[in-house]
């Protein structure tokens, strides 16, 4: 992991880039969203595909599909490179409401009127094996702002050999979920 970061710095100093894609919300990179860069990764990679994510607030859901292994997301600064979204997996309450709490329904993936309707229930979903990330904050705004309510995942990693270095994960409940099987190793 440290070797990869050191190599990236050496390439940057030499004037050539080790990255296959650069994401910048301000438009100064190859892509403005992380998902656009993920979509451009060739299927069936057998070596790391490095994506630099410049500092910024990326308000989006990111899904790394199973057919895109070896995706590496590398941020500039974990406090300034933030992938976030406001969503939860709460279902509509019927009958007596629990403590008057129904505000979550507006941001539920089950609500047909919600902007996140039918989204997968996490800010980031990793299905591609050999995923690596560093220097990025993954934040589910629902959990951070509400501090109560239904499940609000920031990260759902279903892949094998996923590595996380110098990252932040923020939400309220069930912030990070991993696959429930014997072949999903995380580092």
Locate each region found by the language model.
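Bacterial Sec-dependent N-terminal signal peptides
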Residues: 1-16, 93-107
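Acidic Gly/Asp/Thr-rich repetitive segments characteristic of extracellular carbohydrate-active
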Residues: 19-52
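Right-handed parallel beta-helix/beta-spiral solenoid domain characteristic of secreted/periplasmic
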Residues: 23-27, 50, 69-150
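Short, T/G/N/S-enriched strand-turn elements that build extracellular solenoid repeat scaffolds
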Residues: 32-43, 58-67, 73, 178-179
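Glycine-rich phosphate/ribose-binding loops and adjacent secondary-structure elements
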Residues: 38-41, 163, 169, 185-187
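Feature marks extracellular polysaccharide-active and adherence modules
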Residues: 54, 65, 74-76, 127, ...
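Short active-site-proximal "capping" loops at secondary-structure junctions
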Residues: 56-60, 78-80
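Glycine-rich beta-solenoid repeat tracts in large extracellular/virion proteins
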Residues: 62-65, 85, 122-127, 144-146, ...
């Amino acid at each position: 992991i440290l070797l990869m970061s050191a190599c990236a710095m050496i390439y940057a100093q030499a004037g050539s880039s080790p990255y296959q894609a650069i994401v910048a919300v301000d438009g100064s990179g190859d892509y403005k969203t992380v998902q656009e860069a993920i979509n451009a990764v060739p299927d069936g990679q057998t070596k790391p595909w490095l994506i630099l994510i410049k500092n910024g607030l990326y308000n989006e859901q990111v899904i790394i599909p199973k057919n895109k292994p070896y995706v590496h997301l590398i941020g500039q600064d974990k406090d300034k490179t933030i992938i976030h979204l406001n969503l939860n997996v709460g279902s509509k309450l019927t009958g007596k409401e629990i403590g008057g709490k129904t505000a979550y329904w507006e941001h539920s993936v089950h609500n047909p009127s919600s902007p996140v309707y039918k989204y997968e229930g996490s800010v980031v979903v990793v299905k591609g094996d050999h995923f690596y990330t560093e220097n990025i904050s993954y934040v589910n705004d629902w959990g951070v702002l509400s501090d109560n309510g239904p499940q609000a995942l920031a990260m759902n990693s279903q892949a094998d050999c996923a590595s996380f270095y110098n990252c932040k994960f923020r939400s309220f409940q069930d912030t990070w979920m991993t696959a429930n099987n014997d072949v999903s190793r995380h580092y």
